[in-house]
């Protein structure tokens, strides 16, 4: 409920916008189906849960805390892990807020009610602080059981139905009450006034998800959906209403009822609302009408998705928002991020999200709730008033009043009823839909109605466009969307916003963010001065402070506000097209929020905005677009945006308002992010700087964008970049600002994805960022890409509605929705990567650094062009284009804050003129994708990692490189982002005029290419690269497919392939250097970069000669290859900056998503998920070739990507690989299209299989390495399939798909080696395979981390290599390769076969490699690869490409989140290299994959490779790669199998064999390893089994040395000995303490009861005095029972072993003793011991490795021993703290054995304390040393205190003879020195040693 409510809060603004009307019909259709019932019921249940302890618990912390703090904390919490709990609890809080809210009426008040401020609103029962409020709400809930139950129910249900459940209960009410209530009308009326307050808090959230706010504002049904959340709001209002019977009581009661029982509540609500409508209609209508208009527009933007959703049944919608159904466009948009991204994390997050948002509301509304109330009702009240309004009614009324909302409107019953309505908004989804649609048709008229209908809360719901973002999702699936939207969807939509923006927590956070921003901003002139809609939006934004916590909320708010003016302005001014209008409306909806946020932020950043003021208008729009996309576009925007865009009823005034609002939006965003995060501050600083710079650039619009970009590089820049920036901005925001803002990437499209990042950034920027980033973002990939698309669209619309309209027009409404989805997906990709890069706030800091660095680069490259760009953007068309470019530039800018300006300018220059000249649709679309791509690629990657500088350097240098070669155009592309942006700009700006039609395809390509060139683009360029990133982000996986599609389009020109070889070298060398230098020293690589830019042009050229031949890349055919190469180079560059690569990868992913979106917007089917795999690639290709197919194919892809996005959370499970493949094929167009699509399908499936698994791990555990693995796998799959033009090969994927779903994890593990092998084999089947595999390996190695390096060496090789070899090399540049392959496919047959073969085989190997790395990651091998950026960099350098490549891939996939992004590219490169040798086997790739599956040989090879990788990864990564390479070559040659299914078998067979061999290695011939460890001693290690080889030896040795050294220092007797052995001898296993070694073993003698066991030291039983349990059994190493199977044998063996090994033990003991006495002894002892032990272990047989304990404890053996007893490890008793501490922690303390012989078993059990404190006893590597000696001494040593034998703890004072039992020493008062585990007797404890 909170989620919903928060959405409502956002939607409060949005509800004010009549935009809801736009989506009304759709939402209604969507919601009416049965969603109402389901939703309501579910919401009821959820409401119960929400309002029950869980919600309160989750949120009470949030609400109880000061609003701001709570908001932040809650947001964080909800971001981190409480997403479920906190989200939901927050939602209940929200509901509570709503309950008190009506009294408070402004949504912000409601939000405030959430926080401490809420008590004022709940005058009747003001509780202290937020908790009081919460309790109050709880009480109110109690009073109003329905809402209480409903929300609590939602809380419980929400976990599995985060949004669906959350929303459903309200939704059920909705259908009942909505249909009859027709609340849409009231909501529309009230939407302006009443929804505002509601939207401000919960209603906004409500609207956000249902259609209430965004969709509801668009459609009353949507509004009602929001009101479902608003139902929560109603509870919030109920505290108000309770006190204010007439006003608040009605609304709250009804709302609560609505929440609880949709029909009754609905009816009552309707009646009340109607009554209220009559009363407040005029007042509310007046102010709220405007607001409602804007709100609704924003909501309509949100309603964008409803078209998609509308088709969905309630169940479908639920599914949409359920992990499985997160495919549904609306759901994907609105909910997918949460569900799709990380079903568990996000869903829980979303669940918590509502609660968290409540806290945000609380934080934003309590601290900024007033402001937010204002902002929500900012329509009416001033933020201060809202915040200050203690009186629920007065406060709400005042804020509303201040916002020109009549006081009585707030206090009025109608307002209250509106609040109730708001609470019912979820339940009103259908009615709200209708109303919103009607409102969309008649914005003002309906707006008035809505004003009346929707009380401030409702208004809040509508006004809360940010929440409306969730709304977007909700309207998308109004019926189903609405119920989930109500709470879950609202949460999801909002969370989607947040997901996209900040993760599942984001919805609430963003809601609060918006509220907070608006609230904090309200005071800011911008929010108030913006426009009433903006004010409303500001209300949503609430306050910059809150925004800091919930930047996304603020952002959404901003969106809501921004779109109002900007969007209506642009919509009305730009296009008449209904689609555009829909988009405009959707934008407007978000514009309101954006405006609010913008105002809030602008006020905050007014200083920065002073110069950017002129720009803000244009910028504001883009931010709004982003925001709107985030909110509206996420759920509704994607689906509904097309629809809202269609209704051109968006009033021009709104549009105009939007412009104004946009203005502030950027600055506000910019400013708020600084507030939100520490990094934001730097960004903020940068922002002003950037602002100054950008304004300097010359275009007002671009300037603000850049400014925004600077602060929130992507987001603000998105403002300036309009269409392009929405994605660029969110990505940057995500990476930089989002974390800085809480949810600031509030651009719901980008914002959602970024919101996840931002929210993560806020609360758990790092933890959640990885998780949300990987999980949410993957989710975002579905919703966010749509949102991103929408946002992109909207932003572009804001900048140039024409472009947006063009984009929208490009595809039908549905197509548009799909496009939005697709774009959103792409954006997601970028955002995801941004998320990844943003994973750590430090990353953001580094981003700042990098951005500054990038800034310089941008200035270098973009300065000249930037100014022109800015100038160009000045023109409406140019600005759009410019915006897009600027978005990219902004991304670049983001990398370097200073750069943003230049970058923005540069992109703007490129974009602006072309955009104006070119068809706006394509241009806009391209712009959208372009900015998405660059933003994703550059900003995310660059901004996220500490390597940001490198990443940016990579990106910037790449773009710079392209810029140099391309001249002005290339120059624009030079910066990574800038390059991507410029690439797009070049396409857009330069070629746009040339290739207007192909511009869109070109742009996607450009997006891909620039990104590839930049580095993240690598993933895009590489079919695999994108998937890699997708995997990395989870969403990127979706994006990956899209990315692949996008990247594929870039490869239309086979000539480019040939050309490609050289550019990669150039780019690789130059860019690599740049990356390495960490500066934007990409200028030298401008040529290479130019290639990437050209690829963008090339793809365009493929589509249309002009584009291909544009200045950017005159040589279209040859250039594409070049571009591809460039992309690869970037890819390589990425590896160099592993971290950056990771981010870039996500960015790339995003960018591909953008591209795919463009291409795939038409595909709206759920199957698009499959298509996403193949469709994006294929469609990318097709789009490149055919512009027209792009929309259709794009649409298909759009859905597919959504599905994929969903699969991020539940992608794999929902759709079997086979099914996906089939769907993919089905969705594939005609012959060529089908073929391509099929090819893509296969990769998509492969990728998806790998991707979902990887994505899931990432999402669940925030394991960047696994996600990177996924991206590589996905990249490979994509690359393979896309590379393989032949669809036949792609067929393999389906089988794998089917199996993959079940054995996804296994497949993932196996896929790496299998695919690698397959690819290698495919490539290696020919005689040239050995070399080819080496190349692929190298490529993978060099592609991401060593993209530059590898390219330097391999890239050169590529050009150097003759036809086939260069081709192989080209494939090595997989980034390019994916597109290149497509290009090849399209172009020359010879090239095509080669390219295809290379791509396919390589792709497969890439996939295999990616999966292998993942497996390694699981094994922990990733340490070498995942962690090793260096290894990644090494990869290219090492001449062990095969094995290295797998390692590298593993590294890139695992270790590099960046490598993830780069990993995708890198892996594909590897694939390319591997398959390169078999150019003609592009099609055989699939069969090969299958073959791989089939033959055990292949499996074994794969496994061997994996094993080597695993084993060598940590230590022998380089050596292992050598072996692996040969193996891989063999595998490649021998395994022409499909890697899809064989992977599983390979994994099982190889893994098992491998593991067994490792563990047993019986055939291994023993040898003595002589190592000179120290100058003093020679260490001999007897290696009796492979497991004991150096690696294991060294590990135990070092740990032993460490332990022994530490222990020896502490040990009195063997101190010197131990130290020496530890230092010199100990490093060798034999050099471990020379004392007897005991290993923790299994309990062999079960006859020994615990009661009869005594400590072998003190002879006391367990728990004697305070000694605790006995630890053990410890066996002498020679007597250690052989594992469990050999336990029985062990008794027998122990006899012989004991006989043989006891002497050895004694010998060792003697040696140890002598070592103690003699320094030289340790050496002898060491040598002797190893020999003796070796012999002993040999007799022992297989058990000996485990028994080799002291001498050569194998890692395996050690781990086994350690595993036997967790406490035994890592503790050493010796003199040193570590050893001693280890010992204490371990079992050492409890090693009590019957005695040394201890019967047959030789079991020794000891008390931990005894072992730890006994001198000479220490635990090393799980082995207990000196225990036997200590036992011998203890037998005769009487205790000084009790005089009993067994005393082992001696006074450490020199000469002191006191010895005690540990308990006696305790009793005696001895002093225990834990530092070295020594003891001082009472006599000496005060004396110095």
From Swiss-Prot:
It is found in: Cytoplasm; Nucleus. Residues 322-336, 1015-1024, 1084-1102, 1378-1388, 1597-1609, 1720-1732 have a biased composition (Low complexity). Disruption phenotype: Haploinsufficiency cause obesity and craniofacial abnormalities. Homozygous mice die during gastrulation and organogenesis. The few surviving mice experienced postnatal growth retardation and most of them died before weaning. Keywords: Activator, Biological rhythms, Cytoplasm, Isopeptide bond, Metal-binding, Nucleus, Phosphoprotein, Ubl conjugation, Zinc, Zinc-finger. One of its GO terms (cellular component) is cytoplasm. Detected in all tissues examined with strong expression in the thymus and brain. Expressed in epithelial cells involved in organogenesis. No expression was seen in the corpus callosum of the brain. Signal peptide: none annotated. The modification Phosphothreonine is found at residues 455, 679, 1051. The modification Phosphoserine is found at residues 322, 328, 551, 666, 863, 875, 1047, 1105, 1332, 1343, 1400. This is Retinoic acid-induced protein 1.
């Amino acid at each position: 409920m909170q989620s919903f409510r928060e959405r409502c809060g956002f939607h409060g603004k949005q509800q004010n916008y009549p935009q809801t009307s736009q989506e009304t019909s759709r939402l209604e259709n969507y919601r009416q189906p049965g969603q109402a019932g389901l939703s309501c019921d579910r919401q009821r249940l959820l409401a119960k849960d929400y309002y029950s302890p869980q919600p309160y618990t989750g949120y009470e912390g949030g609400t109880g805390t000061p609003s701001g703090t709570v908001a932040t904390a809650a947001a964080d919490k909800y971001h981190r892990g409480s997403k479920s709990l906190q989200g939901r609890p927050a939602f209940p809080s929200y509901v509570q807020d709503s309950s008190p809210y009506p009294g408070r009426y402004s949504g912000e008040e409601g939000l405030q009610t959430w926080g401490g401020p809420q008590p004022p609103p709940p005058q009747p029962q003001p509780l202290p602080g937020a908790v009081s409020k919460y309790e109050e709400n709880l009480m109110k809930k109690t009073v109003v059981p329905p809402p209480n139950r409903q929300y609590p129910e939602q809380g419980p249900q929400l976990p599995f139905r985060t949004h669906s459940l959350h929303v459903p209960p309200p939704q059920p009410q909705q259908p009942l009450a909505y249909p009859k209530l027709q609340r849409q009308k009231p909501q529309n009326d009230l939407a302006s006034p009443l929804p505002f307050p509601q939207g401000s808090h919960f209603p906004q959230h409500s609207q956000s998800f249902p259609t209430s706010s965004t969709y509801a504002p668009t459609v009353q049904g949507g509004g009602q959906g929001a009101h479902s959340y608003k139902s929560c709001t109603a509870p919030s209002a109920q505290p108000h209403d309770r006190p204010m019977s007439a006003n608040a009581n009605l609304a709250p009661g009804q709302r609560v009822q609505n929440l609880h029982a949709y029909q009754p509540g609905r009816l009552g609500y309707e009646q009340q609302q109607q009554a209220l409508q009559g009363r407040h209609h005029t007042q509310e209508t007046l102010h709220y009408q405007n607001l409602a208009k804007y709100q609704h527009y924003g909501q309509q933007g949100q309603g964008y998705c409803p078209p998609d959703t509308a088709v969905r049944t309630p169940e479908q919608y639920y599914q949409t928002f359920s992990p499985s159904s997160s495919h549904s466009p609306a759901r994907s948009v609105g909910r997918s991020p949460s569900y799709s991204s990380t079903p568990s994390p996000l869903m829980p997050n979303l669940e918590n999200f509502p609660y968290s948002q409540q806290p945000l509301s609380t934080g934003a509304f309590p601290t900024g709730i007033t402001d937010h109330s204002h902002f929500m009702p900012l329509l009416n009240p001033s933020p201060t008033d809202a915040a200050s309004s203690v009186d629920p009614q007065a406060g709400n009324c005042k804020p509303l009043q201040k916002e020109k909302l009549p006081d009585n409107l707030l206090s009025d019953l109608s307002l209250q009823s509106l609040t109730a309505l708001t609470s019912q908004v979820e339940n009103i989804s259908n009615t709200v839909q209708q109303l919103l649609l009607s409102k969309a048709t008649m914005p003002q008229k309906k707006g008035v109605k809505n004003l009346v209908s929707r009380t401030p809360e409702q208004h809040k719901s509508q006004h809360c466009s940010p929440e409306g973002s969730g709304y977007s999702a909700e309207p998308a699936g109004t019926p189903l969307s609405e119920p989930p939207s109500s709470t879950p969807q609202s949460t999801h939509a909002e969370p989607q916003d947040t997901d996209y923006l900040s993760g599942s927590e984001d919805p609430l956070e963003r809601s609060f963010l918006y509220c907070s921003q608006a609230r904090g901003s309200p005071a800011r002139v911008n929010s108030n001065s913006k426009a009433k809609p903006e004010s409303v939006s500001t209300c949503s934004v609430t306050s910059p402070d809150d925004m800091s916590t919930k930047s996304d909320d603020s952002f959404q708010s901003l969106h809501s506000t921004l779109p109002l003016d900007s969007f209506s302005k642009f919509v009305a001014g730009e296009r008449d097209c209904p689609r555009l209008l829909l988009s405009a409306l959707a934008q407007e909806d978000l514009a309101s929020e954006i405006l609010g946020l913008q105002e809030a932020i602008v006020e905050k950043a007014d200083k920065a905005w002073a110069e950017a003021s002129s720009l803000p208008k244009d910028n504001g729009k883009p931010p709004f677009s982003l925001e709107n996309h985030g909110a509206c576009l996420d759920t509704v925007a994607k689906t509904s945006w097309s629809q809202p865009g269609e209704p051109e009823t968006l009033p021009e005034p709104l549009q105009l308002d939007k412009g104004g609002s946009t203005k502030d939006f950027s600055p506000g965003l910019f400013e708020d992010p600084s507030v939100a995060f520490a990094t934001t501050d730097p960004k903020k600083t940068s922002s002003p700087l950037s602002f100054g710079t950008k304004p300097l650039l010359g275009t007002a619009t671009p300037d603000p964008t850049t400014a925004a970009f600077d602060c929130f590089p992507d987001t603000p820049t998105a403002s300036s970049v309009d269409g392009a920036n929405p994605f660029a901005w969110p990505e940057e925001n995500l990476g930089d600002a989002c974390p800085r803002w809480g949810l600031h990437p509030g651009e719901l499209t980008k914002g959602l994805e970024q919101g996840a990042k931002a929210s993560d950034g806020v609360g758990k920027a790092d933890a959640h960022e990885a998780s949300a980033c990987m999980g949410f973002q993957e989710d975002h990939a579905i919703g966010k890409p749509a949102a991103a698309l929408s946002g992109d669209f909207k932003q572009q619309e804001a900048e140039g509605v024409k472009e947006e309209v063009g984009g929208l027009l490009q595809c039908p409404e549905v197509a548009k929705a799909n496009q939005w989805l697709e774009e959103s997906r792409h954006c997601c990709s970028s955002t995801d990567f941004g998320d990844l890069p943003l994973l750590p706030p430090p990353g953001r800091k580094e981003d700042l650094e990098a951005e500054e660095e990038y800034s310089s680069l941008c200035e270098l490259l973009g300065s000249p062009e930037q100014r022109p760009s800015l100038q160009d953007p000045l023109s409406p068309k140019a600005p759009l284009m410019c915006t897009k470019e600027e978005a990219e530039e902004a991304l670049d800018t983001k990398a370097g804050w200073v750069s943003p300006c230049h970058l923005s300018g540069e992109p703007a220059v490129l974009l602006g003129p072309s955009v104006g000249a070119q068809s706006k649709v394509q241009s806009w679309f391209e712009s959208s994708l372009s900015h998405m791509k660059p933003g994703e690629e550059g900003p995310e990657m660059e901004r996220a990692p500490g390597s940001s500088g490198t990443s940016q350097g990579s990106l910037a240098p790449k773009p710079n490189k392209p810029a140099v070669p391309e001249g002005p155009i290339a120059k624009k592309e030079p910066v990574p982002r800038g390059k991507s942006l410029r690439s797009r700009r070049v396409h857009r700006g330069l070629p746009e005029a040339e290739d207007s039609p192909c511009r869109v395809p070109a742009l996607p390509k450009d997006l891909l290419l620039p990104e590839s060139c930049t580095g993240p683009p690598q993933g895009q360029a590489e079919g695999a690269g994108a998937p890699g990133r997708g995997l990395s982000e989870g969403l990127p996986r979706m994006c990956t497919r899209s990315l692949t599609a996008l990247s594929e389009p870039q490869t239309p020109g086979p000539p480019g392939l040939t050309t490609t070889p050289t550019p990669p070298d150039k780019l690789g060398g130059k860019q690599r250097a740049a990356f390495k230098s960490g500066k934007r020293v990409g200028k030298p690589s401008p040529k290479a970069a130019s290639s990437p830019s050209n690829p963008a042009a090339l793809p365009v050229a493929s589509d249309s000669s002009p584009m291909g031949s544009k200045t950017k890349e005159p040589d279209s055919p040859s250039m594409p290859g070049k571009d591809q190469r460039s992309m690869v180079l970037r890819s390589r560059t990425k590896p160099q900056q592993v971290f950056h690569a990771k981010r870039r990868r996500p960015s790339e992913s995003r960018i591909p998503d953008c591209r795919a979106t463009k291409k795939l917007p038409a595909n709206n089917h759920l199957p698009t998920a499959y298509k996403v795999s193949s469709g994006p690639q294929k469609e990318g290709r097709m789009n490149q070739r055919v512009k027209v197919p792009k929309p259709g194919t794009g649409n298909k892809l759009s859905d597919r990507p959504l599905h994929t996005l969903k699969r991020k959370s539940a992608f794999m499970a929902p759709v079997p690989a086979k099914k996906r493949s089939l769907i993919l094929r089905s969705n594939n167009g005609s012959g060529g299209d089908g073929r391509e699509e099929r090819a893509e399908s296969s990769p998509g499936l492969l990728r998806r299989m790998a991707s979902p698994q990887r994505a899931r791990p990432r999402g669940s555990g925030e394991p960047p390495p696994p996600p990177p693995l996924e991206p590589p796998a996905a990249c490979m799959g994509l690359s393979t399939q896309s590379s393989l033009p032949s669809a036949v090969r792609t067929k393999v994927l389906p089988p794998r798909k089917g199996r993959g779903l079940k054995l996804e994890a296994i497949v993932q593990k196996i896929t790496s080696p299998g695919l690698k092998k397959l690819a290698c084999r495919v490539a290696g089947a020919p005689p040239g395979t050995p070399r080819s595999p080496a190349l692929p390996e190298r490529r993978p190695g060099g592609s991401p981390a060593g993209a530059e390096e590898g390219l330097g060496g391999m890239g050169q090789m590529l050009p150097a290599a003759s036809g086939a070899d260069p081709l192989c090399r080209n494939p090595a540049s997989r980034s390019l390769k994916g597109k290149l392959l497509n290009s090849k496919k399209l172009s020359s047959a010879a090239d095509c076969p080669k390219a295809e073969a290379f791509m396919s085989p390589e792709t497969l190997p890439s996939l295999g490699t990616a999966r292998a790395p993942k497996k390694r990651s699981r094994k922990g091998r990733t340490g070498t690869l995942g962690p090793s950026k260096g290894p990644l960099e090494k990869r290219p350098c090492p001449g062990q490409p095969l094995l290295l490549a797998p390692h590298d891939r593993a590294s890139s996939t695992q270790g590099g989140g960046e490598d993830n992004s780069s990993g995708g590219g890198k892996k594909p490169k590897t694939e390319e290299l591997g398959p390169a040798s078999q150019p003609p086997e592009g099609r055989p790739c699939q069969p090969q994959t299958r073959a791989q599956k089939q033959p055990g040989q292949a499996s074994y090879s794969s496994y061997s490779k994996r094993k080597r990788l695993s084993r060598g990864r940590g230590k022998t990564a380089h050596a292992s790669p050598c072996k692996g390479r040969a193996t891989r070559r063999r595998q490649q040659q021998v395994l022409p199998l499909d890697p899809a299914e064989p992977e599983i078998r390979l994994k099982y067979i190889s893994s098992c064999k491998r593991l067994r061999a490792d563990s047993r290695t019986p055939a291994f011939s023993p040898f003595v390893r002589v190592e000179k460890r120290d100058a003093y001693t020679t260490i001999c290690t007897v290696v009796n089994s492979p497991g004991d080889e150096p690696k294991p030896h060294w590990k135990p040795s070092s740990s032993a040395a460490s332990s022994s050294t530490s222990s020896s220092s502490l040990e009195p007797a063997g101190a010197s000995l131990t130290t020496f052995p530890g230092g010199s001898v100990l490093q060798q296993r034999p050099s471990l303490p020379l004392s007897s070694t005991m290993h923790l073993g299994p309990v062999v003698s079960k006859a020994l009861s615990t009661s009869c066991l005594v400590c072998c030291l003190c002879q006391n039983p367990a728990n004697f005095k305070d000694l605790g349990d006995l630890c053990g059994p410890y066996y002498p190493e020679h007597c250690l029972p052989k594992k469990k199977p050999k336990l029985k044998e062990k008794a027998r063996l122990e006899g012989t072993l004991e006989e043989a090994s006891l002497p050895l033990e004694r010998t060792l003991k003697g040696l140890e003793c002598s070592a103690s006495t003699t320094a030289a002894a340790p050496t002898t002892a060491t040598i002797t011991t190893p020999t003796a032990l070796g012999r002993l272990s040999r007799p022992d047989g297989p058990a000996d490795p485990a028994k080799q304990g002291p001498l050569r404890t194998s890692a395996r053996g050690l781990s086994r021993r350690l595993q036997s007893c967790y406490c035994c490890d890592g503790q050493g008793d010796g003199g040193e703290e570590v050893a001693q501490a280890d010992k204490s922690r371990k079992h050492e303390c409890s090693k009590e054995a019957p005695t040394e012989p201890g019967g047959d078993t030789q079991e020794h059990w000891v008390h931990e304390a005894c072992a730890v404190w006994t001198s000479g006893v220490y635990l090393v590597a799980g082995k207990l040393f000196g225990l036997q000696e200590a036992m011998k001494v203890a037998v005769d040593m009487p205790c000084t205190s009790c005089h009993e034998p067994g005393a082992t703890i001696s006074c450490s004072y020199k000469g002191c003879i006191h010895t005690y039992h540990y308990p006696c020493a305790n009793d005696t008062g001895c002093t225990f020195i834990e530092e070295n585990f020594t003891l001082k007797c009472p006599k000496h404890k005060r004396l110095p040693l």
